[in-house]
Amino acid sequence: MTVLSHLKQVQQRNVATLRRSPLAEISGALGDLGTLLPLMIALAVQGSIYLDSTLVFSGISNIVTGAVFGIPLPVQPMKSIAAAAISRPEYGKIHTVMAAGQWVSLAVLAMSLTGLLRWVTRNVPVPVVKGIQLGAGLSLVMAAGSSLLRDLDWTRPVIDNQLWALGAFLVLIFTQRLPRFPYALCVFVLSLAFAFVAVETKDGDVHILLQMMPNADVWEPRRWLHWNLNWFEYKPISMAIGQLPLTTLNSVIAVSALAADLLPDMPTPSVTSMGISVGLMNLVGTWWGAMPVCHGAGGLAAQYRFGARSGASIIMLGLLKLILGVVFGNSLIGLLKHYPKSLLGVMVIAAGLELAKVGHSLNHGASDLWETSAGEAGDGSGGITRHHRTLSDDERSERWTVMLMTTAGILAFRNDAIGFVAGMLCFWAYRLSDKTQKWWEGRKSITSGETAPLLR
């Protein structure tokens, strides 16, 4: 299949899906705001990124990925880099953040082009990948509770409190069996209305309040960062080292596996194409101060949870970002700072639970449990058949243990790399135990054969 024919098929599928369920696609496009908004706003306020460039280039990335892959792949912040820039002021300079993003992108791009990512994917067991997804999902739930919902009062302020969070959560539960209900779209519209009300009713100087409202601030791509990105300083390199395992495992390997689980009827993007996509997104946008971004399993789960089933959803999101970035740019910061945490937190929880749910297929339906054989098909004609491998109780227990060990490492140390190492060590320990047991049984059979009498 040529590139043009592939793109034509993808666009036909995108259009057909959008026509079939337009509200679901629009709602799904907004499903990942819980991950995007808090980090993007925090980085923009402290000057670590340019909000206008971030909206423009992340919007372009959304449009391109939706048109090329045809599934709702998210464009998310690089969380480890963002966390370091926010928590440590000396790491928050824009040139440092951009250099860190470029280091990660260069590394992922090199791994993709050399085939190293494919080798890693073949040799990472499914229970470890599932553990990374489960850990990422539970991390989102915990982050929603600790950073968005915990400090809210029950009744104050009137438009952002725990009662609103409880109400949003109950509506989420009641509508979970109504796939066409545009939950994220409704929450987004309500949140924007609350943000406008919060700004309008805020006490202070009228001129300051007017500055907090969006106004025409047309983006001009003149803030070129040139070559002064401090590439070889310790700070960007250390930030990149912390981000690389997260990007490789969660934004490339795990998101490819999750796409196969959630959208089995759609062509699954390869880890190589995911890596190239991450590399190119940042090697372009970071020169203009755009936030370092990647794909992510959590974002895909969130957009799927709220209705997205094709690339049409993120193409619409990309167009919205592009328009906002070009027309309003940095004037949006004041409004976005008042986005209600109560409603945002519930969306993050829903996204985390959707991602964590993929762990249920570990012992039934996982990709490594399907076996292919040549033989008679059901209609009597010869062909290739697929059947599900039956696991013993010991195998089920072993796979659960490896997955939970991976998840435990992620949650305990808040680090995907440590969780990955813990899961792999657990997996290899089981393999070593199996080989040791076989060797010992072989020794016992040889010994018993040597000591048996010749005549009976």
For the regions a language model picked out, list residue spans one by one.
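Transmembrane alpha-helix interface/packing and boundary motifs in multi-pass membrane proteins
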Residues: 27-28, 63-73, 241-246, 280-290, ...
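Membrane-embedded alpha-helical modules
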Residues: 90-202, 316, 320-456
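Intrinsically disordered, low-complexity regions flanking or connecting the multi-pass transmembrane cores
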Residues: 1-20, 24, 122, 379-381, ...
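Hydrophobic, membrane-embedded alpha-helices of multi-pass small-molecule transporters
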Residues: 23-34, 160, 164-168, 200, ...
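Hydrophobic, membrane-inserted alpha-helices
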Residues: 35-41, 58-62, 79-84, 164-173, ...
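Transmembrane helix-boundary motif of multi-pass solute transporters/channels
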Residues: 27-89
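Hydrophobic alpha-helical transmembrane segments of multi-pass membrane proteins
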Residues: 27-30, 124-128, 158, 238-248, ...
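Membrane-embedded helical hairpins/re-entrant loop segments and their flanking transmembrane helices
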Residues: 2-23, 42-64, 239-311
